[in-house]
UniProtKB/Swiss-Prot annotation:
Organism phylogeny: Eukaryota, Metazoa, Chordata, Craniata, Vertebrata
Subcellular location: Lysosome membrane; Endosome membrane; Cell membrane; Cytoplasmic vesicle, Autophagosome membrane
Stretches of the chain found on the membrane's Cytoplasmic side: 400-410
Region entry Second lumenal domain, spans: 229-375
Keywords of this entry: Autophagy, Cell membrane, Cytoplasmic vesicle, Disulfide bond, Endosome, Glycoprotein, Lysosome, Membrane, Signal, Transmembrane, Transmembrane helix
Name of the protein in its database record: Lysosome-associated membrane glycoprotein 2
Lumenal topological intervals: 29-375
Domain of life: Eukaryota
Intrachain disulfide bonds: C40-C79, C153-C189, C232-C265, C331-C368
Family: Belongs to the LAMP family.
Single GO BP term: cellular response to starvation
Keyword Transmembrane helix: yes
Protein encoded by which gene: LAMP2
Provenance organism: Cricetulus griseus
Membrane topology classification: Single-pass type I membrane protein
Amino acid sequence: MMCFRLSPVSGSGLVLSCLLLGAVQSYAFELNLPDSKATCLFAKWKMNFTISYETTTNKTLKTVTISEPHNVTYNGSSCGDDQGVAKIAVQFGSTVSWNVTFTKEESHYVIGSIWLVYNTSDNTTFPGAIPKGSATVISSQSIEIPLDDIFRCNSLLTFKTGNVVQNYWDIHLQAFVQNGTVSKEEFVCEEDKSVTTVRPIIHTTVPPPTTTPTPLPPKVGNYSVSNGNATCLLATMGLQLNVTEEKVPFIFNINPSTTNFTGSCHPQTAQLRLNNSQIKYLDFIFAVKSESHFYLKEVNVSMYMANGSVFSVANNNLSFWDAPLGSSYMCNKEQVVSVSRTFQINTFNLKVQPFNVTKGKYATAQDCSADEDNFLVPIAVGAALAGVLALVLLAYFIGLKRHHTGYEQF
């Protein structure tokens, strides 16, 4: 017997042993697959798919999100065959099917390819779609998990292939379960190691003292852009993205090992673009001012949130990281780049040179502490002048008082 459970994300207490349908945006899937009356494959996860397709109306694009499963079946799910291959298979009626495979090795198991098949001939799901027919999207994975460990990834994992975006989160799964007991040992995905979500504080009648969790600092990454065979831009920095659009702030540390980078260099501007499974793009655009300095002029970002929505912000009127041309800008302490009211970037151990890179190495750095010194010098000078003026006035009034006293004695 196979038992499946679908429970609403909203936290409703209604749970059916095999299927629950309701008017919510996405569902948590749970599969407890037995073999000889003992669990051999366990999985609990959330997912949705966004598919863009061409329509007969002036060949415009429409988008459909598959997030409310109807007529769901799990035919074809298996604990493993003679070749050591297990599979989870999900069918959303006759329109969409999804499956993922697992391969058993000597000391670990591997999450393999994810297959998504959809049929645009279904006019209910894909009204006015052209052309009609079946389409297959394959997302190749190769995640190795130790045997007897359960894989956990609460972070949003996004895979974009062509016109299809797949979102997965709150994943807990174990293939090839030993002795029917799901493991308590977790193998945590890299994204969970670098994401911290600050929980809201729940106030009682007499609020107890609370502290806001401090997110871990991000890993420092090295990024570069080339123009032909020569490096034209260098950047070293740890990046922490802060989104405050929702009631619960979302804090995301960029992991350099899973982040791609590209860019371009021009005489007056330079661009560094970062992207990964969660960030569609994060652009840093530098510009030359007064033909003697460079600065960070623009930041553009578009990223997927935990609920599958897309958060986008752009600001082309910034003024950060100012330094003379021919030098680099450095700031080892934490800095905040406020891009908008709802988005900021915290940088750690920053060093950047977007122009005049020679032999692929940083030039002499302008330290951000110099900015503070430049700010403090006029304050110190002003304070000194104010002190001198106060002494002069004090001496004047003392002399004036003595002068009057002399007249009275005379």
